[in-house]
Design a protein with these regions (language model features):
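Short, small/polar-rich loop/turn modules that mediate ligand/substrate recognition or access, typified
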Residues: 169, 174, 229-231, 237
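Active-site helix of classical SDR
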Residues: 119, 153, 161
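Conserved glycine-rich Rossmann-like NAD(P)H-binding loop of the short-chain dehydrogenase/reductase
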Residues: 28-42
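Alpha-helical segment proximal to the catalytic Tyr-Lys
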Residues: 124-125, 166-170, 227
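Residue(s) in the substrate-gating loop at a strand-loop-helix junction
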Residues: 137
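Substrate-binding pocket helix/loop in short-chain dehydrogenase/reductase
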Residues: 95-105, 188, 195, 199
Length: 243
């Protein structure tokens, strides 16, 4: 029997890499994209293949319409896409009061327009009951003085995804949004030990989240046990932010 296919953007590291491994273990063949570095993505692919599952990494800059267009005609598309995880993103820390229009345009192009572009490119290849997860952020709801452009892009992503959920629900497709809090990814890589401790103390569960925490939630959102959930923003943050 042919295994279902999961497409994960930004699948070479962090939440994307953990999700690729989890969905492969769940029974999916995984097509993941990367942009700046092939090595981490290939390591994820190798790990998945060593377990006897199948995966493939392809270079796609989601802000580049040409590269996104090529993704839309990738040979794996002929199999149909059962799961789409829009996980790619960029976060440059810029004080809200100092944010330039160029900062905003650049971040929106990657985080929001890039996600919509990927959706448009693969839309015709989605299976009738496809499940889509957009990886947003708690900052898309609460905002941030250190990342207004990022917060705005994630707010736009979430609102678009909720609109999409209403549009494609009658077709049998589901769309949900994962909104992580603090997660141990590249975004927090420059934390000093003091800053890390400060973050942990802010979280009621007293720890920073892991990429695997997020991957487990995505696995649930694309699985049968969430079959009546669509258009939801799922906050996974250890109690840090309670909207």
């Amino acid at each position: 029997m042919t295994r279902p296919v999961a497409l994960i953007t930004g699948g070479g590291r962090g939440i994307g890499a953990a999700t690729a491994k989890r969905l492969a273990a769940d029974g999916y063949d995984v097509l993941l994209t990367y942009n700046t570095s092939s090595k981490p993505a290939e390591m994820v692919v190798d790990e998945i293949r060593e377990r006897g599952d199948d995966a493939l990494a392809v270079k796609v800059d989601c802000a580049n319409t040409g590269e996104v267009g090529l993704l839309g005609i990738h040979p794996w598309m002929a199999r149909g896409i059962d799961v789409l995880v829009l996980n790619h993103g960029a976060y440059d820390r810029v004080a809200a009061s100092d944010m330039s229009m160029e900062d905003l345009r650049r971040t929106m192009l990657v985080n929001f327009e890039g996600a919509v572009a990927v959706w448009k490119a693969v839309q015709v290849h989605l299976t009738p009951h496809a499940r889509i997860v957009a990886v947003g952020s708690q900052l898309g709801t609460r905002g941030s003085p250190h990342g207004a452009d990022y917060s705005a892009s994630k707010a736009a992503l979430a609102t678009w995804a909720r609109s999409l959920a209403q549009a494609v629900g009658p077709e049998g497709k589901r769309v949900n949004i994962l909104a992580p809090g603090f997660v141990d990814t590249d975004i927090l890589a420059k934390d000093t030990p003091e800053k890390r401790k400060e973050r942990e103390l802010q979280v009621p569960l007293k720890r920073v989240g892991t990429p695997e925490d997020m991957a487990h939630t995505i696995s649930f959102l694309v699985g049968n046990n969430s079959s009546y959930i669509t258009g939801a923003i799922i906050h996974v943050n250890g109690g840090l932010y309670l909207p």
